[in-house]
Amino acid sequence: GDLEKKKSGSEYFGVGTVSTSYCDNFIAYSLDLKGSEYYTIYLRDLRTGKNEKDVIENTSGSVTWALDNKSFFYSKLDQYHRPRQIFKHVTGTSSDQDQLIFEEKDETFTCSIGITSDEKYFIISTSDHITTEEYFFPTDAKEIIPTLFKKRKNDVRYSIDSWRGYFYVHTNEGARDYKVLRCKTNQINKLEVFIPAKKETVIGGFEFLDDYILRSEKSDAIPKLFVR
């Protein structure tokens, strides 16, 4: 806020993200004080109102907390301002000790990390403008080994989410205006059609609400919402 801007002494003050730990005791926030869009991540203890010693430079600005409330994930920017590495940071330690958990080798792709709706898996997404590829690993994994969901294929985009034992896949593979597939989380090679492609209809994203799935479509320029 204004206090942080005043303390920084910088004419430029860009906020990347403010992310609260699951226990609500900490926030990780990122700032760009130069206008370079290279963000530095800071950690604050909300119980004391004071910042911890944790400082992580040259990041994309995004933060995804782990469920243990003691660590979080972030992406690091390379010299060309592309996020191509995902790291795990343990609070209270130096960023020099952060664990590299994923690196995108293709310089035309960039990567990010998020968590599924049921908080069972972390999802690493890597993409260029027309192609995506995603990896997953359990949020309670003792050893992080990202598993490839489906190998990248030129001009095919997909994104995955999980809910109640299933992965749901929103994809344009064989469906210009998208469709939704699903599979059991332990059988990722056995995909089945959940919402088929429809002529002249864009199949949008979806959200999970207990026993229901809220999803969107658009046809004749009219957006529609469905509850399933």
What are these regions (language model features)?
Residues G1-R228:
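Peripheral, non-catalytic segments that deliver or gate enzyme domains
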